[in-house]
Amino acid sequence: MPFVKGFEPISLRDTNLFEPIKIGNTQLAHRAVMPPLTRMRATHPGNIPNKEWAAVYYGQRAQRPGTMIITEGTFISPQAGGYDNAPGIWSDEQVAEWKNIFLAIHDCQSFAWVQLWSLGWASFPDVLARDGLRYDCASDRVYMNATLQEKAKDANNLEHSLTKDDIKQYIKDYIHAAKNSIAAGADGVEIHSANGYLLNQFLDPHSNKRTDEYGGTIENRARFTLEVVDALIETIGPERVGLRLSPYGTFNSMSGGAEPGIIAQYSYVLGELEKRAKAGKRLAFVHLVEPRVTDPSLVEGEGEYSEGTNDFAYSIWKGPIIRAGNYALHPEVVREQVKDPRTLIGYGRFFISNPDLVYRLEEGLPLNKYDRSTFYTMSAEGYTDYPTYEEAVDLGWNKN
């Protein structure tokens, strides 16, 4: 793959991106974060992180000491899953391989955070049915799309609106997964309440039609997410917990900016986090998906919601904020964003194709193009074989 054409890199060495910052108990050397990136290389059965490639992949991207690495979405339990090749962290065999991955990251003097993931209606009902599992959702009055509704009918596994007992079990599963993460050597966990997955489905009035204490009002829709937050604060400590949100996201049939109450909903969540912070329980960070990318399945520049901004979060939440969404090709925007001393920047797809991304950002070097066709394939190709800048020059990529 050649370098990205038409891109004029700018060195960010003299910006706050290369100032240290403390996240929880970890002292980062810079603020360029590797965010969660689903890669579908785990082995089935068992949802086990890939024993051959995963530690190599993460170690390559942790090569700059002091880098914050947030893992790909990781299932907290079989019931939370439904993708055969995404990893989990509920079993001893999974934990054993995560230990190797975290060791590879720590050997580079970088830091490992595990994203804890529950799919909800974004899962595959036929895969769940095969394994004797429910097709869970916030409320069964609406499906994510017609295709999944048909799959659910064909598999005789219709949507199941979580009962209060189900919610309690999910919280127990989050606790178990968080404990396993720390026991395996992770520095912390990120609760995934974004991009249309289960916790996000409770936050959004399009997917949440409940009439009990988990639906109907802003406070009720936020209840499940905040109960998970509180459970993990008590289990592993607030300094080891972060939360990811996507206020303007439309992925997996979320409302995004079309919902008039979206700012009010997320302002409430952030306000509740700040209340906990003032009581001595400040989370390590909040991670926001930008309206620059409302749907991560689209290419850069597509799907931007130009009528919204996440700037509102800064007046409510006073802790660190990771901002992610189409920043790699826009260093001039990063230069402005990181003027705020609490801001970190998440770089997704270009961290896939540039294992030495932090070095390239610092020096203002060209970026390797990524190959989207290898994002989710069971292969080392497009996973561990992207070259560093020096290797790419040796390959002649700078001449293509």
UniProtKB/Swiss-Prot annotation:
Q: Name one GO biological process term.
A: apoptotic process
CDD domains linked to this entry: OYE_like_FMN
Q: What class of enzyme is it?
A: oxidoreductase
Q: InterPro entries, from UniProt?
A: Aldolase_TIM, OxRdtase_FMN_N, Oye-like
Gene3D superfamilies given in the database record: Aldolase class I
- Can you tell me which residues form the catalytic site? Y197 (proton donor)
Q: GO molecular function terms here?
A: FMN binding; NADPH dehydrogenase activity
Protein residues bound to substrate: H192, N195, Y376
Q: What is this protein's record name?
A: NADPH dehydrogenase 3
Q: Which organism is it from?
A: Saccharomyces cerevisiae (strain ATCC 204508 / S288c)
